[in-house]
């Protein structure tokens, strides 16, 4: 109930709010001038922003098995990374100490914290298939994760405290930054900053993919990283072949009834090579296959995501508001809708209601019921994919 109350108002795209967030730029102007082109610094992008989570709550999340977390410590020039789940008592002692040069990072904080989810939805001008999550970092004085670069766009929003960012322009492919070998983090070797900026509470810094950045806490501070999903071509290709295989990819077995004794046992024969080539040539797919794969792939939850189902019965959908759970990803393409990795082909009369639920992440129960979706919505509610709260 608390989550729905806190998050309901911000799931709808609001251009005025986005212009304030982007320093007076409209989303269109920001995308044209800055997106994947050059950084943007906005002072006071979120006036009065004190953060979305407390230090104690972040430590509690880092101790959970269903949450991805890391503790990064630097001693002199040596780095140590401890992956979660982390021991809560030890984290609490560390957080209360005067130790410096350490950082606690929690990925997917928006799945467990309503205000972090609100922050993510402030970037609703980007397609939901591209929005990833909010990573929250708490750093003691001197803490950071070293100079690095990301392959995706990121918005860095400063919570409590101050952090200095050292920046370097992206290196064009195929010669990106070199990395320090054998380091526990992907650290840029010989990093040379070309600019520096200090973020204070409520400030926002956008960085395009590939920009080198090194954030160092000037005092104990929180930073909220709104990251974007950027699938790699090889990753998509491998997943697509798995998708085709599940749906009946040709699966012939190699046979060689005319096999003769091998004069050179280690040599791969031309017959086996020809067989492999022929099987690959038989693979066929349509645009529809690609669209279905992409929808399922982009809406599939990460492995550590767990939904909490509801056992409520006797719910009158027409009196409720349906609100997607923060962990739910609902997308659509044409006549296909995708809910957490599953595909749905609704009747034409049902598509508008489902599209509103997907786009706004909420929809009036009356509208869904009139579209004949009551049974489906209640199934999703029992699975924990969405919440049903009393309507206005």
Features from the language model and the residues they span:
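N-terminal auxiliary "cap/dimerization" subdomain that precedes the catalytic jelly-roll/cupin core
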Residues: 2, 6-87, 91, 335-390
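Active-site region of the double-stranded beta-helix
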Residues: 16-33, 46-203, 211, 216-253, ...
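Proline-centered helix-kink/hinge sites
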Residues: 39, 208-209
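Residue-level signal for secondary-structure boundary elements
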Residues: 39, 43, 66-70, 128-132, ...
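Helix-loop elements that line ligand-binding/catalytic pockets
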Residues: 232, 238-318
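Acidic, low-complexity/disordered tracts enriched in E/D and polar residues
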Residues: 279-357, 378, 388-392
């Amino acid at each position: 109930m608390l989550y729905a109350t806190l998050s309901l108002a911000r799931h709808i795209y609001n251009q005025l709010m986005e212009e304030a967030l982007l320093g007076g730029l409209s989303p269109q102007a920001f995308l044209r001038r800055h997106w994947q082109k050059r950084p943007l610094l906005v002072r006071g992008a979120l006036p009065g922003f004190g953060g979305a989570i407390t230090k104690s709550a972040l430590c509690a999340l880092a101790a959970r098995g269903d949450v991805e977390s890391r503790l990064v410590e630097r001693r002199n020039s040596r780095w140590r990374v401890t992956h979660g789940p982390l021991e809560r008592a030890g984290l609490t002692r560390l957080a209360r100490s005067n130790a410096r040069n350490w950082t606690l990072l929690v990925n997917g904080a928006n799945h467990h914290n309503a205000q972090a989810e609100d922050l993510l939805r402030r970037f609703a001008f980007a397609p939901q298939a591209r929005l990833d999550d909010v990573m929250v970092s708490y750093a003691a004085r001197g803490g950071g994760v070293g100079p690095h670069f990301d392959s995706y766009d990121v918005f860095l929003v400063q919570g409590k405290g101050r952090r200095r960012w050292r920046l370097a322009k992206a290196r064009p492919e195929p010669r990106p930054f070199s990395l320090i070998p054998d380091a526990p983090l992907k650290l840029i070797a010989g990093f040379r900053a070309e600019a520096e900026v200090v973020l204070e509470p409520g400030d926002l810094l956008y960085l395009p993919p590939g920009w080198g950045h090194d954030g160092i806490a000037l005092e104990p501070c929180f930073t909220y990283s709104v990251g974007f999903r950027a699938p790699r071509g090889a990753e998509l290709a491998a997943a697509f072949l798995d998708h085709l295989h599940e749906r009946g990819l040709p699966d012939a077995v190699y046979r060689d009834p005319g096999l003769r004794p091998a004069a050179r046992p280690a040599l791969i024969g031309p017959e086996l090579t020809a067989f492999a080539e022929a099987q690959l040539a038989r693979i066929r797919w349509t645009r529809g296959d690609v669209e279905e794969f992409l929808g399922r792939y982009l809406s599939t939850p990460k492995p550590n995501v767990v939904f909490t189902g509801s056992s409520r019965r006797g719910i009158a959908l027409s009196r409720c508001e349906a609100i997607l759970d923060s962990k739910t990803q609902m997308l659509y393409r044409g006549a296909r809708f995708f809910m957490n990795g599953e595909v749905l082909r609704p009747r034409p009369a049902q598509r508008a209601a489902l599209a509103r639920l997907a786009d706004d992440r909420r929809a009036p129960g009356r509208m869904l019921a009139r579209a004949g979706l009551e049974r489906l919505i209640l199934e999703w509610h029992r699975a924990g994919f969405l919440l049903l709260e009393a309507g206005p």
